[in-house]
Amino acid sequence: MGKSNSLPSAGRYNANYGNFQSELYAQIRHEAFGEDIGQNSWLTSDEQDRFLQWLDLSPGKTLLDVACGAGGPALRIAAITGCSVIGIDVHEQAVRTASSLAAQRGLAERAEFRATDASGPLPFSDASFDAITCIDAINHFPDRPRVMAEWARLLKPS
């Protein structure tokens, strides 16, 4: 048996999100992905741009980013499209980092981040969002049909 990591899994995520803004992490993202859009996944800017065409976001529209992590992709969407973003993540350190990045990038008025467990009912009214994204995290939800039904409740018609 190998030696177990002394940090519980949430602690490992918190450590990652706590270091997210460091120059080293930015360099790693740039070397791994060829660019740094603040991603915690293999999503590239080209892929995100294709999704943005489908989502048709613009000023006055609102995006919910589920499992937003440190907020990099959501903040890029807000900057490019002019839409408002609400990002939710179960990890409080991720939310703190995302909020800090929003302030640094001058997006705090249009980008809000909350520590919320997205596996249960979400604290938003019906038809609150024009689009919902969840980048590389749907696999973390054991009851995906229930999660999708909740997202359907939150989406505006059309």
Task: Please report, for each region that a protein language model flagged, where it lies by residue.
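Conserved alpha-helix/loop element of class I SAM-dependent methyltransferases that forms part
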Residues: 41-59
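A short acidic, Gly/Pro-enriched loop at the edge of an enzyme's catalytic core
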Residues: 120-132
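Class I SAM-dependent methyltransferase Rossmann-like catalytic core
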Residues: 31-41
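Class I SAM-dependent methyltransferase SAM/SAH-binding core
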Residues: 62-66, 70-120
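N-terminal, positively charged/glycine-rich alpha-helical extensions of SAM-dependent methyltransferases
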Residues: 1-31
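A short glycine-rich, Lys/Arg-flanked "PGG" loop and its adjoining helix->strand segment in the class I
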Residues: 145-157
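A short SAM/SAH-binding and catalytic strip from SAM-dependent methyltransferases
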Residues: 131-143
